[in-house]
Curated annotation (Swiss-Prot):
Alphabetical list of Pfam families matching this protein: Oxidored_q3
Species whose genome carries this gene: Danio rerio (Zebrafish)
GO function terms (MF aspect): NADH dehydrogenase (ubiquinone) activity
The UniProt record lists the keyword Zinc: no
UniProt keyword list: Electron transport, Membrane, Mitochondrion, Mitochondrion inner membrane, NAD, Respiratory chain, Translocase, Transmembrane, Transmembrane helix, Transport, Ubiquinone
Localization per Swiss-Prot or TrEMBL: Mitochondrion inner membrane
Name of the protein this chain belongs to: NADH-ubiquinone oxidoreductase chain 6
Length: 172
């Protein structure tokens, strides 16, 4: 299990480096998918299966749609590829930063890292499912605000990417 988690953590950092080096928006989309999948895999290994599924569906369903519009807006005739020197040096610098940060973190203790089901013997329900009831009861106002902000973001992206044509909002 420790090898599995170490592999997932390394893949998470590699995906983040792929997004940060960002040779072109098309290649960064692959990094986003890797980070979303690996992050949800880490959540599953710590016992948050429901939360992991919800985050994966929301992230890939919502954010990649907005990312597709941004990639269409920033279309380049000759995008930088992974084999270019500039991208290679960016990856090397980010990798060096990760190695230095890992050196600092490995000298201390692990902090407050614990599983979601650490006290499952004393609980009747799972910890990640109980957050759903809280989201719809006490967090209902915040849920409506977040839905409104996401709808507004979608309209902003549609307006920005429409160019000189009349766009989608004319039909609404």
């Amino acid at each position: 299990m420790a090898f599995y988690l170490s592999f997932l953590m390394a893949a998470l950092v590699g995906g983040m480096i792929a997004i940060a080096s960002n040779p072109a928006p098309y290649f960064a989309a692959f990094g986003l998918v890797v980070v979303a999948g690996v992050g949800c895999g880490i959540l599953v290994s710590y016992g948050g299966s429901f939360l992991s599924l919800i985050l994966f569906l929301i992230y890939l369903g919502g954010m990649l749609v907005v990312f597709a519009y941004s990639a269409a807006l920033a279309a380049e005739p000759f995008p930088e590829a992974w084999g270019d020197r500039v991208v290679f040096w960016r990856v090397m610098v980010y990798g060096l930063v990760v190695i230095v940060a890992a050196g600092f973190l490995l000298t201390g203790d692990t902090g407050l890292l614990m599983s979601v089901d650490a006290f499952k013997e004393f609980s009747v329900i799972r910890a990640d499912v109980s957050g759903v009831a809280m989201m719809y009861s006490s967090g209902g106002k915040m849920l409506v605000i977040c839905a409104w902000v996401l709808l507004l973001t979608l309209f902003v992206v549609l307006e920005v990417t429409r160019g000189l044509s009349y766009g989608v909002l004319r039909a609404i």
